[in-house]
Each structure stands twice: as C-alpha cells, then as structure tokens.
C-alpha cells in the first residue's frame, strides 16, 4: 500500500507490529491521532516512553510495578502463606479482578514449551526455591492455563519441590481444557480458586 507520506507509512508500520492489529486498522489509528489535538498524541507518546523506561519488575514476584516491590507484595493485608503461581501479569490481573484471593503471587514469565524452545531455565523457578527458603509459605497454588504446556510446567515444579513441607494445590478445572487463564470469566475463575484441589501425581 502506498502512502502520501513516509512519516505516515512509518507510523503505520510501527502500529501494525502490535498484536492483533493489521495495516488497515493501523492506518485508521494513525489517521485518528492526526485528527486529535497535538497534546493528545504527545500524551500517548509520553505514556509509551514511560512504559518502556520507568516500569519495574517486582523483586519478590516479578509483577510489573512502579517500585522495586509491588503493591501486592508490600501489602500487610495479603498473607505470605499462600503463593499463587501464574504464567504472566495478565493472569494476576484476572485473578485480582475476582476479589477472591488474599495471598501473593509468583509470575513464572511463561510456561515450559519445547516446541517454542522454552525450558525450565527460562522461567522464574528459582524464585520458588527462594520463597521456600524464607519459610513463610504454607501452600503453592498452581493457576496455570489448562493446556499441555501449563500441565507440564506444574508437574515439573511439583516434582522438583514435592519433598518439602509446603502443600501444592491447583485451581479447580472450571476452566475449559485448552483455555488460557486470562480469558476465563471472573465468576468461574473465582470459584476455581476457592474450590482448588490438592495437587499430586495422581491428581494434577
């Protein structure tokens, strides 16, 4: 597609590189921004720059944060005894929206997937051992997607740490097999957390 301006073409190229946005949608968004006051486009640009430069990863759970320790980990209203193990920040947001969970989190940063070249060494599994060594955790809750990769990841972690004093559980399968956690509705996800099941080799 030819554009009347190289600047416009560059903007369309960059916007269309975002997930789920094709070139036609990117063009509509670029044209929309051009119709807005300059302050609107500048505000968006500054927000994106701040997103890249200023956002931090929580040292405790690997969540996104404005500070070295996120609000959840630093809250005295959240128990240290429950740690919910999830794949990424979208899962934390989904679970928080249920209002049913009062523990803390540990974000793995993905799941074991040999097809995509992701092994245990690419995940934040050492942080689980760190939590165990601190001696505060009573239960780890697996809240991973109901996929083969999610099940493989949970099983690997369980096998690695099963001989510890900590209990392992998994959210109840109100989530359909093959579904990612972030797409579950809040009511089903909340019930899955409240009705979680003990995790063991015979009941993954």
Indicate residue ranges for each PLM-predicted region.
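Cys/His-rich Zn2+-binding cysteine-cluster or related metal-binding knuckle/ribbon modules and their
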Residues: 2-9, 17, 30-92, 198
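S-adenosyl-L-methionine-dependent methyltransferase catalytic core, i.e., the SAM/SAH-binding region
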Residues: 8-16, 27, 33-36, 158-171, ...
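Conserved phosphate/pyrophosphate-binding and hydrolysis machinery centered on Walker-type P-loop NTPases
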Residues: 19, 38, 51, 63-64, ...
